Amino acid sequence: MISVALIILFLAKVISGKSDDFISVNPETNMLIDGYGRERFFHGTNVVVKHFPFHPETTGFNKDTFSEDDMKILQKFGLNSIRLGMMLPGYVPKREEYNETYIKVIQSIVTTAAKYGIYTLLDMHQDVFSPKFCVEGMPDWIVNTQGAKDFPMPLHKPFNLDPKTGYPYPEDCAKFSWADYYFTEAAGQAFQNLYDNVDGLRDEWAQFWKKTADVFKEEPSVIGYELINEPFCGNVFKHPTLLIPGVADYLNLQPTYDALQKAIRQVDEEHNIFFEGVTWDFFEVGFTEVPGGKQYQNRSVLSYHYYEPPDFSKKLNFEARLLDLKRLKCGGFLTEMFTVGTDFNSMFEMFDLCDKFKQSWHGWMYKSYGCIEQNLGCLNMSSPGKESIQIANTSRTYPQAVAGRTQSYAFDIKTKVFTLVYETVGSCKSGRTIVYFNKNLHYPNGYRYEINPNFKVTPSENEYFLYLDEVNKVPNTVVTFKLFPLSFTDSEDIHPVTVMGDKHLSENHNENEKKKK
C-alpha cells in the first residue's frame, strides 16, 4: 500500500510544477518532456564568460554577476533556462590538471538557479578555437596547428606575438572581424587535429565531458550537455569539400560526437546531449543519426542558432530544422539568437516563429561579461536599479509545461492576447498545465481568461503562473485557453465575476477592484 507520506510528496511536486525526473525527448513528437510526460518549453538567455576566471561573479549585482539577484530577475520575466558557459580552459587549464574550484562554482550556479525554477544547459563555448587565433574557447595545451602556415595566413602575413601571453596583439586582431579568423590555416588545422584525435586531444576533450557529467549526473535541473558551440568544419584548405553544407557534419562532427557521447554515457545515461552542426547548414544538417545512435534518440537535442547574416530566412530555417528533427527523431532547441540591440521587430518575429514551431530558445546574451567583441549585453548600468534590464523585452506569456500534446500557442505582443490549444493524453501522469504570464508588464489593469472545457484555473501565489488543472481526467480532450488584458475602461467598469457553463469558464481579475478591497 502506498504510504500517505508518499502521496503527499507526489502531490506537492505536481502542485509546484516541479519533478525530480530529468528532461528527456519524445522521439515521435520531437518535444522535450518531463518525468510526468508533460511537454516542456524553455525561454532563456546565455550566461557565458569567455575569459578568466571563465565564470560570472556569484554575489552582488553588477555587469559581471550571475547571482541570486540576477536569478530573481530572470524568474520574474519568465526566463526559466540559462545556457551556461562550461569552459574547457576554466576546468582544464593544463593538460590532465582539473580545476576543482571552477567546477564547484559552476555547480553552485546550477543548484542555486534551480531554486528559482531555472534549468541549465551546460555549453562548452568557443569562437575560432583559441586566443592564439584572436578569439577564445580552448586552453593553449589543446591547440595543435601542426601542418598549417603561421596565423593568420592566408588572411594576412603572420602576426607578431606578445611574449608575455604568446597571443597576437589586440591591435593586430582588430584588423579583421573575429569570424574571418575561422578561414586561416592555423585555426582550421587546430579543429581538424582535434577531430582526428592527433596526440590524443579528442580523448582529452572526451575526458573533460566525462568528468563534467560525473559531477552533474544526478542534477535534474540540468537540461543537458552541449558538446561544442558553433563547431568549425576543419581544414578547408586541404579538404575544401568540407565547406559544402552537411559534409563536415557527417565526416568530422558525427564521429567526434559519437566519441564524446560514449565517454559521457560511461557515467551518465540520463541527461540529454545537445549537438550542433556547422553554422552554414541553411538546409538539412549532415548527421545521419544522433550521437550514439538510435537508442539515444530520446536523450538527444539538435542545437541550432539564427543570425542574419549569415542566415537569410527565419521561416525557412525553422522548416529545415523541423525536417531534421523528424528525420533524426530527436528534440530541437534554438540556443542562440539576438535578444539585444534595437531591432525589436526582428526579435519579436523570431519569438512568434518559435511559438508557431513550438521551439524553446535562448537569447544572446544576458550580459557582456567583459567581452570586448560582444559588448552588447542586456544590462544598462548607466540607469539606476535592476529594472533597467532590457531583458524585459523577452518576457512573453507562454506555456512552461503542457499536460498533453501541444497543438498550438501564440502571444500577440501588441494586444497581449495569449492562446493555447492542446490535447490531453492518457499517458500524462499530471493534469496540470503551467502558463507563465507577466501580470505587471502585460496585464497592468488586470486580465480575464476563457477556457474550454471547464478546467480549474488558479494563479500562483507570486502571480507569475496560471495553473490549468483537469477537473475530470479524460484523454483526447482538446483544451483551448485564452488570456486577455483588461483595458483601463474595462478595469473601471467590470467587476470580478465567474461565469460557468457546461463546457466554458470565463473569469476577470481586476487590479483596481483588488486594491479597493
UniProtKB/Swiss-Prot annotation:
It comes from the Eukaryota. Coiled coil: none annotated. The active site is at E230. Its EC number is 3.2.1.123. GO terms for cellular component: extracellular region; membrane. InterPro entries: GH5_C (IPR041036), Glyco_hydro_5 (IPR001547), Glyco_hydro_5_CS (IPR018087), Glyco_hydro_b (IPR013780), Glycoside_hydrolase_SF (IPR017853), Glycosphingolipid_Hydrolases (IPR052066). Belongs to the glycosyl hydrolase 5 (cellulase A) family. Hydrolysis of the glycosidic linkage between oligosaccharides and ceramides of glycosphingolipids, optimal substrates appear to be the glycosphingolipids with a gangliotetraose structure. This is Endoglycoceramidase. It comes from Hydra vulgaris (Hydra). The lineage of its organism: Eukaryota, Metazoa, Cnidaria, Hydrozoa, Hydroidolina.
